[in-house]
């Protein structure tokens, strides 16, 4: 029967150096524990170990080997294994099998990078699990991109053709994904700062409304307001007196509101005031 083992580039696992041919474990074999032993798996279980490396070893078990198959585990172990050949994981012909690929991306979104024939269904399943696997999508559709940014707004970084709808979905999920928006509109910026006031730092064209909404969501966003008005500063310190530290021009009214909200904010009052 053909078995497999996923290996890293160094082909070293738990201090054991694997090689082509016969590999013999240096530790005493114990069939009562998963510890020690040289592990391997069936073809259908390779998917459980994709994150362990980029190499795939084709394994057979010598007749004289001591073997233990673990129930409810996706692996087995032996005191010796024979590695017939080692290939790059990306070159495995199973990546041409659509059903196999679909199952793979459902377990590891980034395995999309190995899929030879990417279908929209496969890509959608990949980004549902890991939004950043959008990076590996060869033919991006709006549907795939929307699914990705709904999972993580930061996936917008990998969207090749941004639409306003995609950008809005991204900043609704994570306001700071505004940093990846190529064409900012006031609506997109407002959505972004309403989700996370700190997104104001990425707004290219600040308006009074955008700044006001930003400090309403997060008073510390006052730090990023380029044109501080008394109204905006008051909104910030009314919510958190400590926001006084970001006020450039401290008026008496602002100071009073700040210490009223938090007496300890007085430490940010200039002595010379």
What do these predicted ranges mean?
Residues 269-270:
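Short, T/G/N/S-enriched strand-turn elements that build extracellular solenoid repeat scaffolds
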Residues 25-89:
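ADP-ribosyltransferase catalytic core
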Residues 102-263:
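Thr-biased low-complexity repeat/linker tracts and other Thr-enriched repetitive architectures
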């Amino acid at each position: 029967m053909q078995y497999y083992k996923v290996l890293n580039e160094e082909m070293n696992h738990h201090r054991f150096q694997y090689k082509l041919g016969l590999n013999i474990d240096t530790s005493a074999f114990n069939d009562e524990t998963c510890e020690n032993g040289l592990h391997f798996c069936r073809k259908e279980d390779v998917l459980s170990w994709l994150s362990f490396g980029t190499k795939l070893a084709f394994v057979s078990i010598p007749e004289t080997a001591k073997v233990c198959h673990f129930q409810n585990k996706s692996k087995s172990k032996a005191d010796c294994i024979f590695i017939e050949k080692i290939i790059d994981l990306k070159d495995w012909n199973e990546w041409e099998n659509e059903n196999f690929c679909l199952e793979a991306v459902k377990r590891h979104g980034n395995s999309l990078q190995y899929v030879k024939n990417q279908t929209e269904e496969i890509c959608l399943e990949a980004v549902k699990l890991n939004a950043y696997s959008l990076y590996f999508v060869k033919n991006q559709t709006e549907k795939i991109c929307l699914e990705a940014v709904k999972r993580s707004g930061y996936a917008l970084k990998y969207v090749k053709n941004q639409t306003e709808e995609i950008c809005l979905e991204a900043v609704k999920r994570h306001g700071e994904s505004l940093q990846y928006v190529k064409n900012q509109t006031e609506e997109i910026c407002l959505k972004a700062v309403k989700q996370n006031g700190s997104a104001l730092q990425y707004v290219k064209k600040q308006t009074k409304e955008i700044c006001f909404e930003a400090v309403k969501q997060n008073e510390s966003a006052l730090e990023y307001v380029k044109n501080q008005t008394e109204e905006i500063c008051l909104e910030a310190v009314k919510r958190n007196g400590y926001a006084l530290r970001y006020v450039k021009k401290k008026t008496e009214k602002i100071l009073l509101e700040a210490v009223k909200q938090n007496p300890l904010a007085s430490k940010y009052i200039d002595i010379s005031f």
